[in-house]
Amino acid sequence: MAVPKKKTSKAKKNMRRSHHALTAIGLVTCEKCGAPKRAHRVCLECGDYKGTQVLETAE
């Protein structure tokens, strides 16, 4: 069975993990109702996407 010949250093381990960081969700405000929504997605408050009504909402 294969085993490592040398111990992996902290620097090498951290360089390997440099791309594992989490990023924050991109929030924007809806142009129609002003509610916060995720970028490039339908607004859950008013159902609007790029100026067109996509979802039916109970208002």
From Swiss-Prot:
It comes from Fusobacterium nucleatum subsp. nucleatum (strain ATCC 25586 / DSM 15643 / BCRC 10681 / CIP 101130 / JCM 8532 / KCTC 2640 / LMG 13131 / VPI 4355). Keywords: Ribonucleoprotein, Ribosomal protein. SUPFAM superfamilies: Zn-binding ribosomal proteins. GO terms for cellular component: large ribosomal subunit. InterPro entries: Ribosomal_bL32 (IPR002677), Ribosomal_bL32_bact (IPR044957), Ribosomal_zn-bd (IPR011332). Signal peptide: none annotated. One of its GO terms (biological process) is translation. GO terms for molecular function: structural constituent of ribosome. Belongs to the bacterial ribosomal protein bL32 family. The gene is rpmF. The keyword Iron-sulfur does not apply. It comes from the Bacteria. This is Large ribosomal subunit protein bL32.
